[in-house]
Structure formats: structure tokens, C-alpha cells
Design a protein with these regions (language model features):
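Residues immediately flanking
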Residues: 42, 66, 88-90
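A generic structural signal for short coil/turn motifs at secondary-structure boundaries
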Residues: 49, 73, 144-145
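A hydrophobic/aromatic-rich effector-binding and dimerization subdomain
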Residues: 2-18, 73-141
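Short, solvent-exposed loop/helix junctions and linker helices
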Residues: 31-34, 123-126, 152
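Generic protein-terminus/edge-of-domain signal
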Residues: 1-61, 68, 100-117
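Short amphipathic alpha-helical leader/targeting segments
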Residues: 57-58, 73, 150
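All-alpha amphipathic helical-bundle segments outside canonical DNA-binding/catalytic cores
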Residues: 124, 140-153
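Short acidic (Asp/Glu) patches
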Residues: 66-72
Length: 153
């Protein structure tokens, strides 16, 4: 992570544009030292997390803990692969928690339940979630004295 507490990115790639001589899977199996919230928007993609494969649908949300191996697996005619990824440090995740909700517990559940990595956001809530995530991205890209304060709120 470039920033010590969190980063957020909206990524859009044309997977069909990769040259056939390149490896079939342009993103290799990997892990991070931080938590990852992955919001899937589009593409023909399965997602591998710790030996469990999830077939993704628009509006799916994946939670991955530090050091969990994960990788998108692109299927035939994957097309545009669009997602928003939020990387967040464990300390920051704890700071965002309160007596009513522990964000860390959401990730700890993924380690004990093989289905817990994946959450499907209802269609009527998807636009709202994507709006707030894109607003956070916009705030982070605005370089002024208030952007860090707004992003942390």
C-alpha cells in the first residue's frame, strides 16, 4: 500500500485485449499484508480464495484477510473486468469499529467459514454502495488539507 492506513481503487481492464502469447491468467495468485474488500462490478470471472472458487456476479463483495491467497480466474470471453478494491490496515479497521460493530470480526469469520468470503449486495443497494465507494476514491484523489479528514470520516 502506498498510504499506510488504506487505499481504494476503481479498476477497469479489457481482459480480451491481452495478447494470446501472454499467460492466460494476467493476475497471478497473491496475498497482501493488509485486509482487502473487493467489490465486483463486471466481467466473466471466478475468484479463487484459499482453495475455494467463487463464481462472481455483479454486486458481489469479497472479504480477504491478510496473507490469504487469492486470484481472479478469467473465463472465456471475460470482456471488461471492473471492480473496486479497498485495502485497509488492521489498525485502521479496528479504529473504525465501535461497541456495536467490529469490522475485524467480519474478516475473522472468513477464516472459519469457507462461504463467508462472499457476500451478495442486493441489486437495489448496489448503486448506492458504488456511489459511496467512488466518492471515497474522488476524495482521496483530491489533494487539499481536508481530503484526509473527509476520507477518514
Amino acid at each position: 500500500m502506498k498510504h499506510s492506513e488504506f487505499e481504494i481503487h476503481h479498476r477497469r481492464d479489457d481482459i480480451n485485449s491481452y495478447h494470446p502469447s501472454q499467460e492466460k491468467q494476467p493476475i497471478q495468485l497473491h496475498h497482501h499484508d493488509f485486509y482487502e474488500v473487493y467489490y465486483f462490478i463486471s466481467g466473466n470471472v471466478d475468484y479463487l480464495v484459499e482453495n475455494k472458487t467463487y463464481h462472481l456476479h455483479p454486486g458481489d463483495l469479497l472479504l480477504m484477510s491478510p496473507l490469504e491467497l487469492h486470484q481472479p480466474v478469467f473465463r472465456e470471453d471475460s470482456g471488461i473486468y471492473e471492480r473496486i478494491v479497498l485495502w485497509i490496515d488492521g489498525k485502521k479497521l479496528s479504529e473504525l469499529s465501535n461497541s456495536e460493530i467490529s469490522f475485524l470480526s467480519c474478516f475473522k469469520q472468513t477464516q472459519s467459514d469457507t462461504e463467508a468470503h462472499l457476500y451478495h449486495i442486493r441489486e437495489e443497494k448496489q448503486k448506492t454502495l458504488q456511489y459511496f465507494l467512488d466518492e471515497l476514491i474522488s476524495t482521496m484523489q483530491t489533494e487539499n488539507q481536508y481530503s484526509a479528514l473527509i476520507a477518514n470520516s
